[in-house]
């Protein structure tokens, strides 16, 4: 079960 991330990860550190 893969749930779409929302809000989407814009900044990734």
From Swiss-Prot:
BP GO terms, sorted: defense response
GO cellular component: extracellular region
Domain of life: Eukaryota
Subcellular location: Secreted
Chief location of this protein within or outside the cell: secreted
Keywords: Amphibian defense peptide, Pyrrolidone carboxylic acid, Secreted
Entry's family note: Belongs to the frog skin active peptide (FSAP) family. Tryptophillin subfamily.
Protein name per Swiss-Prot or TrEMBL: Tryptophyllin-T3-1
Biological classification of the source: Eukaryota, Metazoa, Chordata, Craniata, Vertebrata
């Amino acid at each position: 079960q893969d749930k779409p991330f929302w809000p989407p990860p814009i900044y990734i550190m």
